[in-house]
Amino acid sequence: MEQTDTVPYWRLSGFYLVYFATLGVLVPFWSLYLKSLNFDASQIGELIAIIMATKIIAPYLWGWIADHTGQDLLIVRIASILSFFIFALVFVSNSYWWIAFVMMSFSFFWNASLPQFEAMTMNHLGKGVDDYSKIRVWGSLGFIAAVVGVGWLIEIYDVAIVPVTLLVLFGIVILSVFLLPASRKVLQTEKQESILSVVKQPVVLALIVVCFLLQFSHGSYYTFYSIYLQDHGYQSSQIGWLWALGVLAEVILFLYIHRILPKFGHRFLLLLTLALTALRWLLIAFFVESSSIIFLAQLLHAASFGLFHAISISLFHRYFVGKHQGRGQALYASVSFGAGGAVGSLFSGFSWEYFGSTISFVVSALAVCIAFIVTYRYIHVRKGFHNESV
């Protein structure tokens, strides 16, 4: 895909690159940093849940503002600047309540950026929304570079390098957002239905439930996977490479998803994704001592995150059109990464503390099985859906 006058490919890709590089540090290694501060599993689960919980309200609030002002790019810029300065306060104190305060304040603004940027990207792409994956793949590459690099740095220096690296990356995010052009707004010449009437559609409600359950199932993974591997003898560099492997599989999928979606349809691929995700959690639960099986489980990240995310972004974009686009993407972030992620992280903290790692991942698999049933029952094929089947 080449850059054109209407699609600023490299500037959009650059934001994804650096934004997800920050996640390549935050997601795998922040729990290790919290563990180094002598927080227990319940406290770590709570602190990670705070980051997720702000996604319940923040994206939708900022999405509402963006939809009513048309200033989505300005919101992304302000949110990025405030995120940088608030996160810098993490160096003031290592107390639980201070870290909790900083995480809540920082993530309220940080979580405002991505949903608005997703909507901007879709607007830039126009009718070529299936090319989204060609831009989003740069985010995966940024994640890989960060997770491998920081895993290596931790072994050389110490886990204390994590917050320093994050602050540097947040600064680079600020630079990237000031290189971005404003997106083209889709003008609506006819009256639209209310956003509530869109949400009340059975297929949309089912999709929301499935998104919640899928991200809930990731609670143990995002919160404790690095600690889990470390407790079973894996080195920091190995942990970094395993995270990178999962995202590399995601990258390969993103390169072909624009061909796969039209060919197989959203419903079939969604069911396949959920089945593979349940398998992934069971493999991690029972075969952590086998590096080859853990290797295989990480390859399934292509399904549990990559494929699911591509399907969800596509469906929310098509159901929430025109003036609802910003809030549509925000709703996806709120119910999945927000509510699902927060409840999953919080639950995993208590589950890990009192029932252990195996039970925690088994519960994750059960949640995905419920999502599979909901999808099979309520998300049906509908012909004429932009020449694709749902």
Regions inferred by a protein language model and the residue ranges of each:
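Juxtamembrane intracellular "pre-TM" segments in multi-pass secondary transporters
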Residues: 1-6, 179-213
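Helix-loop boundary and gating motifs at the non-cytosolic
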Residues: 2-52, 204-242
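Hydrophobic core of transmembrane alpha-helices in multi-pass small-molecule transporters
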Residues: 17, 86, 96-114, 212, ...
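Interfacial helix-cap and linker-helix signal at transmembrane-aqueous boundaries
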Residues: 34-35, 65-66, 137, 152-157, ...
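Helix-to-loop junctions at the C-terminal end of transmembrane segments
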Residues: 57-71, 154-155, 252-266, 352
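Structural signature of the two symmetry-related core transmembrane helices
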Residues: 74-88, 167, 268-283
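Cytoplasmic helix-loop-helix junction between adjacent transmembrane helices
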Residues: 104-138
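Symmetry-related core transmembrane helices of the 12-TM Major Facilitator Superfamily/SLC fold
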Residues: 161-178, 359-378
